[in-house]
């Protein structure tokens, strides 16, 4: 771990030097797994790395991902002391049989303990991540999970669709039995039941897969149409460069993306020798920027104004997206979108 932190220190210092004038940071996010794997002195060290190279805004946001199975009360206390105020707990599902099927055993009591500890310490926003479409999951079983989560009353919920890609992921995902997965019809039913349940529970649907209490800033941003989405998820921040550091980290500079190597030994060797080179990258052209804008608008607001895009990008929408328009007409017949010459609007099923 110390060798990895040495490499991380070198990368952060190198990025700061490359950017020139000492930059201000609006948000710091510890993610990519379980940062609480680090001990207290290691966590302090990472935070000190950031402060030594950048100025975090006075109202800057510190957020992290944590695993209730391994996160201790002492860690939560330390992280709060270091400035973290937003925390996201990966729960996935609370049904013991489903947890066993995905090799992630976690009791309801563990989730309760970590959430209540964070709340009592003063964390201002607590999120839970759930996943629908997991093996052995049904509408009834997932509703029970939602009922338990509702009792905990997190500020936000992220409810993601499970993607079964056995060739791309770790051993425990390859071990999942395909026959145990819910059918596409059952998966859609779980999704629609989730929307209904959370609406009745007082949560506002944010974009495609997030929910928040009405007073949460994401809910307010959605209401005011100032919500945005980047590769990290939904945010109230806009036009902010994202600098990713660490193994496999992704950076976004508006019209370009790049990613560090996913090989940890390679990362440590290159970063320590100050020879770290991105392994993937993409520069967006005008067409890419147009399509990204369309996708983000749909994901944030569930609809797009065709006339607005025609004016801003100087295009004839149906001509420019002639192939996609044929698909949209098909989706309209299937009840996935509402379609007119002025607007494209997603339905709940869509």
PLM region descriptions:
Residues 1-18, 24-318:
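C-terminal scaffold of the Radical SAM
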Residues 340-350:
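Accessory beta->alpha helical hairpin/"wing" motif in late/C-terminal subdomains of nucleic-acid enzymes
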Residues 316-332:
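Short amphipathic alpha-helical interaction segments
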Residues 330-342:
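A short, conserved structural fragment
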